[in-house]
Amino acid sequence: MMQDLRLILIIVGAIAIIALLLHGLWTSRKERSSLFRDRPVKRHKHDRQNSFVDDSDDEAFDNQQKPYAHKQVKSHQEYKAEPAIERRQQKLTEIDAATPEESDDPLLTGRQPETTARRAAIEEQEPQLGLFEFEEQNESERNGSAIEEKSQEAAGEKEAQTKVKEIVLVLHVAAHHGQELNGESLLQSILQSGFQFGEMQIFHRHVNPSGSGPVLFSLANMVKPGSFNPETMVDFTTPGVSIFMMVPSYGESSQNFKLMLQAAQRIASDVGGVVLDDERKMLTPQKIELYKARIRSTLGVQV
């Protein structure tokens, strides 16, 4: 009985000793693994503290040597990357790349300049897509303006040439020196010469003596304003009348001038007056030829 009890105690003691040994080994390994796992963190903390100390020393030195550059040093230190922060930024690179907006986290400020620069480059390229269109549009507008200006200049030159081509030939029927023409006899002679009273209150010679068709030449009073009143011409007197025509005119200008000359000579004969040229001098054959030459010259320019 005593031997059995002793054997049991020996076995229980051996088991207890083995359990204690195993527990000691397990505890030792656990502490060792925990020690190795904590060492990098402590080392990183120590390095970061040293970095902060170095930065503080550098800042103090720079403040002593360059007091006016304090803001530049501080700005440079804010963007200075720490070892632990750089590793954290590397882990968050994928997250930042997937995020469309810029992060406000101070730890990610190192990445913001790159993102901002990329966006700025894209934004600068986008407006340039329409730059050439705008330049082409401006070029088209300038070309259109130049063409329009040239067209206006050509039209102006053409109009000026047209105005230069048109001339006025004038003949005067005047009374002798110190006399005046009688209105009643003058009116009868004017009507017999084929004139009709019309626009501007003067007489006009139309293609048809009845008063229809285009006007070939006209007759006005030499006294301003040059108009007539047929109802009061019985008691009317005037120093003379003026007959004028435009060149070119309807039909043949040379033939129209002959008709005007014949009408002036007939009226002068009826009222006892004389025919004068545009300078109010006696009309001579040489002056008549000069009128015809002016007509030919004007028509030649037109052609």
UniProtKB/Swiss-Prot annotation:
Membrane-topology descriptor: Single-pass type I membrane protein
SMART domains: ZipA_C
Signal peptide start-end: none
Cytoplasmic-side positions: 28-303
Keyword annotations from UniProtKB, A to Z: Cell cycle, Cell division, Cell inner membrane, Cell membrane, Membrane, Transmembrane, Transmembrane helix
Superkingdom as given in the UniProt entry: Bacteria
Topology, Periplasmic side: 1-6
Family membership noted in the UniProt record: Belongs to the ZipA family.
HAMAP family attached to this UniProt entry: ZipA
UniProt-recorded name of the protein: Cell division protein ZipA
Organism annotation: Photorhabdus laumondii subsp. laumondii (strain DSM 15139 / CIP 105565 / TT01) (Photorhabdus luminescens subsp. laumondii)
Gene: zipA
